[in-house]
Amino acid sequence: MPKYRSATTTHGRNMAGARALWRATGMTDDDFGKPIIAVVNSFTQFVPGHVHLRDLGKLVAEQIEASGGVAKEFNTIAVDDGIAMGHGGMLYSLPSRELIADSVEYMVNAHCADAMVCISNCDKITPGMLMASLRLNIPVIFVSGGPMEAGKTKLSNQIIKLDLIDAMIQGANPNVSDADSEQIERSACPTCGSCSGMFTANSMNCLTEALGLSQPANGSLLATHADRRDLFLNAGTRIVGLAKRYYEQDDASVLPRNIANKAAFENAMILDIAMGGSTNTVLHLLAAAQEGEIDFTMSDIDRLSRKVPHLCKVAPSGQKYHMEDVHRAGGVIGILGELDRAGLLNREVNNVLGKTLPETLEAYDVMLTKDESVKRMYSAGPAGIRTTKAFSQDCRWDSLDTDRQEGCIRSREYAYSQDGGLAVLYGNIAVDGCIVKTAGVDKESLIFRGPAKVYESQDDAVEAILGGKVVAGDVVVIRYEGPKGGPGMQEMLYPTTYLKSMGLGKSCALITDGRFSGGTSGLSIGHASPEAASGGIIGLVQDGDMIAIDIPSRSIVLDVAENELASRRETELARGDAAWTPHNRERQVSFALRAYAILATSADKGAVRDKSKLGG
């Protein structure tokens, strides 16, 4: 029978000092022996996805206490990728994932907590907490802050849906008036919550459902809706039950590594491909798998991407649907239901509800359930009122979207495409693979060939795009922006956005060893591995080199002879200590980022730390 971890600090005369300090936090004799649950919050006023979380930790804590546990809350940092975008702040985004994972480990292990409720939401916070959960392997439930309502505005006498990406595109479009640009900007992000499309934050929150570590509707129920309160209350109750099952009944099935096992990781990736999730999810799933010592690699992602159809097309891949529409159609469970009926899921998996996948689908799939309370939950809709407060409205759709032919979520028979929303490409420019969000690529661009325009920083690429130096047919190559070379693997949202602003979104390709925002669409290929700073061939590309991209064949090739590449490599190595660094780039890099770069691996490994350098 496993012993409560917290007993280390609450039992025995030698722990009198620790108990004295626990008493100073409000604990009493009756509390010693109860499970101590860490409530891991990520409230901050910097991030709209987290601005409403201040009191939600208390909500969970009160429910934990009422259910027989002891709740202790602490906070992690949270970086807003949208605000950090387009300047030096973006260098800190991906490294913050490791800091979040470490800070959770530090707090939980230092104080011997028995279990966790992780209150996450945005881009690096959910992945960081997920990495920590699998590293620590103690009972955990994720409950996110929820998605933002989609923005809406009236242009040309027509009501249109908006999100952050629309504001960015139109803000840089010289053909859009100042008045229209300002109207879009003011309307794009109307409420608290994670940005309203299938961007990285919402993608990751959806994947926690497929991994079995969060409750149904976690990924899709709006941040503003009153129904979301129940997710927090239920998380507080359920985590005490999970802790007692493990520590008092020796039931290891409730541990995250046994719930989020390889079969669950495959299901999460299948969901991601089917819903055209952010390419960043690949990076984060690979990282989380390594933390959990789960054998899940790029090869698995490549294998799965070849058989999974695209069942749910959401912004930024199209503007008709946002997360509020996914929820109306049944949310993540609705997509999983269609994937299950297509025979694509591993069914022998469990979740924090204590249910198998078939049991969960029977109870929560809107196409199967007879439970009116479940249908009511999925009818939760937007209010269209600007607010930063959670649970502030109770609006309902008049009906659910159960149209699996032409609705938001499709059956396999009526899929948006039989080829899924993400693909892994291989070739000499990315020997270890690279990622493209096929959900956002026009059919006419699936096969593309063009001359390279090479830039060694995002800033130089943006200047060239806005300056008219990039023309239709070009392949923009941005290198030395990987985990080690950036350092920090910046998102290339501004270059892809400005290509659209300049009318080049469908006539150019972009390849980088950096990564993309979940808001990116178009022929945007990221995570090229090995990265330039690790000696990858992307570091040898020259202006004018022809690059051939064939997504159906999963290939990407730099059309340069092997002997010429060998000659270029010798020239690069002759630079000595300067080899595999930018030839002409001025960038201030802090010691914190340099420390990150020393241990960073390329994207095909999830950009995690190189354990071999630490003796691991």
From Swiss-Prot:
Co-factor binding comment: Binds 1 [2Fe-2S] cluster per subunit. This cluster acts as a Lewis acid cofactor.
Swiss-Prot/TrEMBL cofactor(s): [2Fe-2S] cluster; Mg(2+)
Catalyzed reactions per annotation: (2R)-2,3-dihydroxy-3-methylbutanoate = 3-methyl-2-oxobutanoate + H2O; (2R,3R)-2,3-dihydroxy-3-methylpentanoate = (S)-3-methyl-2-oxopentanoate + H2O
Domain of life the protein comes from: Bacteria
Residues the record lists as binding Mg(2+): 81, 123-124, 491
UniProtKB keywords: 2Fe-2S, Amino-acid biosynthesis, Branched-chain amino acid biosynthesis, Iron, Iron-sulfur, Lyase, Magnesium, Metal-binding
This protein's pathway: Amino-acid biosynthesis; L-isoleucine biosynthesis; L-isoleucine from 2-oxobutanoate: step 3/4; Amino-acid biosynthesis; L-valine biosynthesis; L-valine from pyruvate: step 3/4
Alphabetized InterPro entries for the sequence: Dihydro-acid_dehy_C (IPR042096), DihydroxyA_deHydtase (IPR004404), DiOHA_6PGluconate_deHydtase_CS (IPR020558), ILV_EDD_C (IPR056740), ILV_EDD_N (IPR000581), IlvD/EDD_N (IPR037237)
Active site, renumbered: 517 (proton acceptor)
A Pfam family reported for this protein in Swiss-Prot or TrEMBL: ILV_EDD_C
GO cellular component, one term: cytosol
EC code(s) of this entry: 4.2.1.9
A molecular-function term among this protein's GO annotations: dihydroxy-acid dehydratase activity
GO process terms (BP): isoleucine biosynthetic process; L-valine biosynthetic process
Family of this protein: Belongs to the IlvD/Edd family.
PANTHER family according to UniProt: D-XYLONATE DEHYDRATASE, D-XYLONATE DEHYDRATASE YAGF-RELATED
Subunit structure: Homodimer.
Protein name: Dihydroxy-acid dehydratase
Gene encoding the protein: ilvD
